[in-house]
Amino acid sequence: MAAAKDGCGLETAAGNGRRLHLGIPEAVFVEDVDSFMKQPGNETADTVLKKLDEQYQKYKFMELNLAQKKRRLKGQIPEIKQTLEILKYMQKKKESTNSMETRFLLADNLYCKASVPPTDKVCLWLGANVMLEYDIDEAQALLEKNLSTATKNLDSLEEDLDFLRDQFTTTEVNMARVYNWDVKRRNKDDSTKNKA
């Protein structure tokens, strides 16, 4: 199946408009356990259960990674919003000749008082120990773009986590169906041995 990237950098399946979920493999529901167990590679219930358990563990690992990304984004979004509010305040004050009194964070629970003269330049931390100077308007545009991207990514992560939960459920149901099939088969074998 061919895939194309949409405007957010998210992959959509060609033709049906469905979004692929970050390369998460879709768990296929086992309708007919008898025919499924006759397929090559499914010789015993134990091997099938082992494969399904491996798939389940992979889904759990993916969930852990997505949850970490979600936590990080949920922390970044309020920071970006707060910085945007500060920039808007500085935009209003840049025409004034009065200095702006503020407190800034030096370390956890340690603030320092400062007097900031009117300015049209700000420095933004971009990450990886990189700070760049921007005009207030440029900084505001950059942060608004970053906020939009972070919000879209958070929505995408929510969808991927929902999709992943569906895969958990499907895999768990498949494991239960294969296990029950094996129990029935063994009971049937035991009853035929007892009759003989």
Curated annotation (Swiss-Prot):
Superkingdom of the source species: Eukaryota
GO cellular component, one term: prefoldin complex
Keyword Cytoplasm assigned: yes
Example GO biological process: negative regulation of amyloid fibril formation
Family matches, as Gene3D superfamilies: 1.10.287.370
Sorted UniProt keywords: Acetylation, Chaperone, Cytoplasm, Nucleus
Major location (coarse): cytoplasm
Location in or out of the cell: Cytoplasm; Nucleus
Positions of post-translational N6-acetyllysine modification: K58
Protein known as: Prefoldin subunit 3
Organism annotation: Mus musculus
Name of encoding gene: Vbp1
